[in-house]
Amino acid sequence: MVIEPQLPAAALSALAELCRRYGRALYVAEPCGHMVPDARVVVSTALSGGTLRQRLRDACRRFEARRLALDLACVRMDFSLPAPYGTGTALTPQQLTELRGRRTVFFSPELCARYFTYEQSGMTHFVLFDDGDTLHRKIALGTELGIPAGFLALPEAMEALPRLLGKG
């Protein structure tokens, strides 16, 4: 059972007891990780700053790697710069393809994501996105750190499946 919003501790404890009784795991959002000591904690791999390695190391220290599960978000975001709050506009796969055009795409080892920049109406934009390769790298990093599980949302990550399944 996966619980995404933050619930009161009493509700989480009741759900945890139900899951224990039926031999099921309870997955909770990171802010709830300390409320239920035996719950699995879902940690997002989507970043707009810092490093993914440090983010996951910090989560491993707070909760133990064996309790973690990666939320392998397939990010496609367009940020107008400067972006002081790290928020951008979500892009559809078609919008990403159109914006990408013939632009040079780079890989950020810190974010474990691909990116490119462009200018429009005098504004610089930074487009951050995932593909099968970046998601594969995130899974490999999680494995290296001892994180045993992860979630991949469909249909958002559909294009990445062939690479993740070793067929692309």
Regions found by a protein language model. Give the residues of each.
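Chitinase-like catalytic core of GlcNAc-active glycosidases
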Residues: 1-48
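Residues lining hydrophobic/aromatic ligand-binding pockets adjacent to catalytic sites
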Residues: 39, 53-57, 63
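Well-ordered, non-membrane alpha-helical segments in soluble/globular domains
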Residues: 8-17, 48-58, 90-93, 132-136, ...
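Acidic/aromatic/glycine-rich contiguous surface patches that form carbohydrate-binding/processing clefts
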Residues: 138-168
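Glycan-binding loop/region signatures in secreted carbohydrate-active enzymes
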Residues: 65-137
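Short, acidic/polar
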Residues: 32-34, 55, 130-143
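A structural motif corresponding to the C-terminal end of an alpha-helix
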Residues: 18-24, 59-67, 137-148
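Extracytoplasmic/secreted cell-surface and envelope-processing proteins
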Residues: 8-13, 78-83, 158-164
